[in-house]
Regions:
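Active-site entrance/lid segments in N-terminal catalytic domains of soluble metabolic enzymes
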Residues: 1-252, 258, 288
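Alpha/beta catalytic cores of nucleotide-metabolism and tRNA/nucleoside-modifying enzymes
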Residues: 1-27, 111-115, 122-125, 187, ...
Length: 374
């Protein structure tokens, strides 16, 4: 790809966000009823190709169950309020009333409480007993400490999620997690990320991960670009990681690693764009935070917001638009892409003539001029 000269001593690639691209219609259209948007990773099949982000404003044990019943995968945050407090509801109510400008300090105080291993097992069991697929997330820093409790509780899919996760973390203070060894010794599929480059993704795929999360610095509640100066626009990031998947398949003799767009997926139109760039599914946060039954009651924040030294996120008030079911599968009563996310994906595929997600990854895209952006 051609590089642009930033100055005499620096060059850089032009990268694109989802807002920078648009999907091109083809010569064929299709009845939406003939379109399948189902997604399967390892032994688990989902009627909707998405994971609900492991954020306390989005996923509680009850919402994880509801999301599973609707065809998706809710991922529990095992470092959040449900594993620190017996009853986090009063704290969730308090957070919903916080002023955004003063919220960071209070969030840091709330999340200073220790994680209780007994609560990890109890929350996972609560979801598992409902009969839906159970997924839970830890950061790389806490994976070794709590992974046994997670597996013993019967998790189906293990998610290791951080702002950015590498296969070659260097630390003089502590022994870093050996991802390859950890995944090899685990009996459940592991999804790991985020990453945003071809090389980083290729290294993560070589660890044996079933899926790779793509993205860091994006998302409605993240301020990573402002704080650290780090971000890769999502359309380019997903396309680069999809290229790594293609090359890894050749290298490994056909092993397929799922690419999951995690960040920058704020509206229904972002989902087909993510798939068009090569994603198999998406991880959704802010759209689900707008649900009437979301734990945050329209307020949204992530673990980056509570970092004790360098917070890289904030509390945002997104408002409420409808139930979780309406947001995922409709019916919609808003014209802005905040509801019926997967009805929109189905219609986008039908409009361009595709019947399967894997086929839709080949759809033509164009770079949109600024005047055509949302």
């Amino acid at each position: 790809m051609t590089e642009i000269e930033i100055g005499r001593g620096k060059r850089g690639r032009r990268a694109y966000a989802f807002d920078d691209i648009a999907i091109v219609p083809s010569r064929r259209t299709r009845d939406p009823k003939e379109v399948s948007i189902a997604w399967q990773i390892d032994a688990y099949r989902f009627e909707l190709p998405f994971l609900a982000a492991p954020m306390d404003s989005v996923v509680s044990p009850q919402t994880a169950i509801r999301i599973g019943e609707l065809g998706g995968l809710g991922v529990l945050n095992l470092e959040g309020l449900w594993t620190r407090y017996e009853d986090p509801q009063p704290l969730l109510d308090e957070v919903a009333e916080l002023d955004e400008a003063a919220a960071t300090r209070r969030l840091q105080e709330i999340y200073a409480a220790p994680i209780k291993e007994e609560l990890i097992g109890r929350r996972i069991k609560e979801v598992r007993d409902s009969g839906v697929v159970t997924a839970a997330a830890l950061s790389p820093q806490r994976t070794a400490q709590f992974s046994k409790a997670v597996v013993d509780a019967g998790v189906d899919i293990f998610v290791i999620r951080g702002t950015t996760v590498s296969a070659e973390h260097v630390s003089g203070a502590a022994e870093p997690l050996n991802l390859k060894q950890f995944i090899y010794e685990l009996d459940v599929p592991v999804i790991v990320g985020g990453c945003a480059t071809y090389t980083a993704a290729l290294h993560l795929m070589r660890t044996g991960a079933a899926g790779v999360l793509v993205g860091f610095g994006g998302g409605a509640a993240h301020t990573t670009r402002n704080v650290l100066g780090i971000q890769v626009p999502m359309a380019t990031a997903v396309a680069d990681v999809a290229a790594a998947r293609r090359d890894y398949m050749d290298e490994s003799g056909g092993r397929y690693v799922h690419v999951i767009a995690d960040g920058g997926v704020g509206w229904s139109g972002d989902i087909p764009k993510a798939v068009a760039c090569g994603a198999d599914s998406v991880m959704i946060g802010s759209p689900l935070a707008r649900a009437t039954d979301a734990p945050g009651r329209g307020h949204h924040w992530g673990m980056e917001a509570v970092h004790e030294d360098v917070p890289r996120g904030k509390l945002v008030d997104l408002g409420i638009v409808g139930t979780t079911e309406e947001i995922l599968t409709g019916p919609s009563h808003t014209p802005d892409g905040s509801m019926n996310l997967f009805g929109a994906l189905r219609r986008s595929m039908a409009t361009t003539g595709y019947s399967e997600l894997k086929e839709f990854q080949r759809v033509e895209v164009t770079v949109a001029d600024a005047q055509h952006k949302r």
